[in-house]
């Protein structure tokens, strides 16, 4: 069970001040469409729940029912913030229903399937009418009344259908509301803001920018033609009713990453979090600095408890997956709507067992639902592919910093003391102490690499050239991939120092003393002893800047591609976790991430993490594509999904 904190005296005082304002509500007749749970509150109070907790439970479940509120309260019994007076954040959106909504849903599905996820996929199709604003739990009823009152005043003043125009730019596609209708909607939003302030004392800031439905943004430049064509297929004149809808979210997690649990987990230690499939986890990158590889620190939506959890038990979820639906009103039709027709209904917060998790949540991290790409199975001109792969499991990580003392005697002779240690190690001219900065891979690391090679063979993928970092772990991984491909006697590995990882990560004031290619070949590793590197070891410097590392990786990758042109289509680079990003980002015409985001991304790439980059014709522009093999997941290390990790949203 995770450890919990206690509210501070200041927080307790704020809570008392906030809830001192709560006054008994008079009974009112229920009206269709109102966002109201007075009778539910009375029932909860009669059951003995404190007023503040009952109001928080109703606000956190959208006032759906007494049972839902009770379930929320019981599941949050260990939540250290259960009695925190911090209110939720609310937002007012226009959402489409009817034939146009279905067309937009089709666009969402097709664009994600063809081009991968972009920022627009984080939220359902909508028009933003205001910024997020806070509202006390005790005033949510009045907020709903404010919306109903405003809609009733404006219902006959909107154009039907709402006129929309398609707009595209290099990194944005959307449907914009024509100016006259947009002005009417802005006045409607301003009227709601005034009504809400009058009834609830909240401050609502109407949306000041052009009103629009975002279709796509923050996507790869190469995807623009495809996305534009899909957007042009949307008939904006289709029948559509628009509903003014209120959603809320927990303000504490507004800037967190939203994840969803796909496998159950029972805690083994006091600081670990229990996982239930279907639950959502909030994760802040700022809280991950001290976590072990393969683990993250997060907070459960269902319980409010925080703790450590294995990274490969969860998958990314849309930002809006945890939002709460509070109610909606049609702005065009005379009937009110309390149900949403778009999407899979998760925003209505049905219990997890009713959401059809097996149908709505693809297990993208553990097992990607795709057909292997058969790179050389199609007739005609072949596209050029660059495969980048991380090395296998390394000895110093498995057996610790002082692993040498476990398997070398006083005379420097290697002695195998564990089944996961290799039978023998290559001789080093500088002595066995050179292994401290240049560790080999384990027996399991060799197996991982052979598995990848065998998978490439089964998918009919032909590798024409192999390059690798000078680190022994990378050379051994490349050699074992070739063994799995049954090419160890036909292909030679070109050891390229320019592919070494960011030298800032090397401990001490000197670079590793790598084994020369001639000695690697003498140790029966398939190394090309005649290869002349593009960036020799003498050009590498200790503690290089991030910009220098990124530039070096891009430069050597371009030179490798140029060197292999007309000599085969497919290049394999075996290097480090950072290489999957550093060697492919600028090839796609993208700007490098900042160093902080880069480091966070690298943490997510497991041993033998594998990505595929394909040239678009002969344009010199490359794009990430589905690899020809399935991902490899092992231990607590997070499974690797290239779309989620490498694609810049």
UniProtKB/Swiss-Prot annotation:
It comes from the Eukaryota. GO terms for molecular function: identical protein binding; phosphoprotein binding; protein tyrosine phosphatase activity; ubiquitin protein ligase binding. Keywords: Cytoplasm, Hydrolase, Nucleus, Phosphoprotein, Protein phosphatase, SH3 domain. Residues 380-649 are annotated as: Protein tyrosine phosphatase. Its EC number is 3.1.3.48. One of its GO terms (biological process) is negative regulation of platelet aggregation. Residues 27-76 form the UBA domain. The active site is at residues 390-391, 576. Residues 254-319 form the SH3 domain. Homodimer. Interacts with JAK2 (in vitro). Interacts with CBL. Part of a complex containing CBL and activated EGFR. Interacts with ubiquitin and with mono-ubiquitinated proteins. Interacts with ZAP70 (ubiquitinated form). This is Ubiquitin-associated and SH3 domain-containing protein B. It comes from Homo sapiens. The lineage of its organism: Eukaryota, Metazoa, Chordata, Craniata, Vertebrata.
């Amino acid at each position: 069970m995770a450890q919990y904190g206690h509210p501070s005296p200041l927080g307790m005082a704020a809570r008392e001040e906030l809830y001192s304002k709560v006054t008994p509500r008079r009974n009112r007749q229920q009206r269709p469409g109102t966002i109201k749970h007075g009778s539910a509150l009375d029932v909860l109070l009669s059951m003995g729940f404190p007023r503040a907790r009952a109001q928080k439970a109703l606000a956190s479940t959208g006032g759906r029912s007494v049972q839902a509120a009770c379930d929320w309260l019981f599941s949050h019994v260990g939540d250290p913030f259960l009695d925190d007076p911090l209110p939720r954040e609310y937002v007012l959106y226009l959402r489409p229903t009817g034939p146009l909504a279905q067309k937009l849903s089709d666009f969402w599905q097709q664009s994600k399937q063809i081009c991968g996820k972009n920022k627009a996929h984080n939220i359902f199709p909508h028009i933003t009418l205001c910024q997020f604003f806070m509202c006390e739990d005790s005033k949510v009823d009045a907020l709903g009344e404010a919306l109903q009152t405003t809609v009733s005043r404006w219902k006959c003043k909107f154009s039907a259908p709402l006129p929309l125009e398609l707009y595209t730019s290099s990194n944005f596609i959307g449907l914009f509301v024509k100016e006259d209708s947009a002005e009417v909607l802005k006045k409607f939003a301003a009227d709601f803001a005034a009504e809400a302030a009058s009834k609830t004392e909240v401050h609502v800031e109407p949306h000041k920018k052009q009103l629009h439905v975002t279709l796509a943004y923050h996507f790869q430049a190469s995807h623009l033609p495809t996305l534009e064509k899909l957007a042009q297929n949307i008939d904006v004149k289709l029948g559509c009713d628009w509903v003014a809808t209120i959603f809320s979210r927990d303000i504490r997690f507004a800037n967190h990453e939203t994840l969803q649990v796909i496998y159950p987990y029972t805690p083994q230690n006091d600081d670990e979090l229990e996982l239930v499939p279907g639950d959502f986890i909030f994760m802040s990158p700022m809280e991950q600095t001290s976590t072990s590889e393969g683990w993250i620190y997060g907070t459960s939506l269902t319980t409010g408890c925080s703790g450590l959890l294995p990274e490969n038990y969860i998958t990314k979820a849309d930002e809006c997956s945890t939002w709460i639906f509070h109610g909606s009103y049609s702005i065009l039709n005379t009937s009110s709507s309390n149900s949403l027709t778009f999407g899979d209904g998760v925003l209505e917060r049905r219990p997890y067992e009713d959401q059809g998790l097996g149908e709505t949540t693809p297990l993208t991290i553990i097992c990607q639902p795709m057909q292997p790409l058969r790179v050389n199975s199609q007739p005609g001109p072949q596209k050029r592919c660059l495969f980048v792969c991380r090395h296998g499991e390394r000895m110093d990580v498995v057996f610790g910093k002082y692993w040498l003392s476990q398997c070398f005697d006083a005379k420097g002779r290697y002695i195998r003391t564990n089944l996961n240690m290799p039978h023998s190690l290559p001789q080093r001219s500088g002595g066995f102490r050179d292994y401290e900065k240049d560790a080999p891979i384990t027996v399991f690391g060799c197996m991982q690499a052979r598995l990848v090679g065998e998978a490439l063979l089964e998918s009919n993928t032909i590798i024409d050239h192999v390059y690798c970092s000078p680190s022994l772990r990378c050379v051994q991984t490349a050699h074992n991939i070739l063994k799995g491909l049954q090419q160890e006697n036909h292909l030679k590995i070109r050891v390229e120092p320019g592919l070494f990882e960011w030298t800032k990560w090397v401990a001490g004031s000197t670079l590793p003393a790598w084994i020369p290619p001639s000695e690697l070949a003498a140790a029966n590793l398939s190394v090309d002893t005649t290869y002349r590197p593009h960036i020799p070891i003498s050009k590498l410097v200790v503690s290089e800047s991030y910009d220098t590392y990124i530039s070096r990786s891009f430069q050597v990758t371009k030179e490798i591609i140029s060197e292999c042109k007309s000599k085969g289509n497919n290049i394999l680079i075996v290097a480090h976790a950072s290489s999957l990003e550093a060697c492919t980002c600028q090839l796609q015409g993208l700007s490098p991430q900042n160093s902080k985001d880069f480091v966070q991304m690298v943490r997510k790439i497991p041993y033998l993490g594998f990505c595929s980059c394909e040239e678009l014709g002969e344009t010199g522009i490359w794009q990430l594509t589905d690899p020809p093999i399935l991902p490899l997941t092992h231990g607590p290390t997070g499974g690797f999904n290239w779309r989620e990790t490498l694609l810049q949203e």
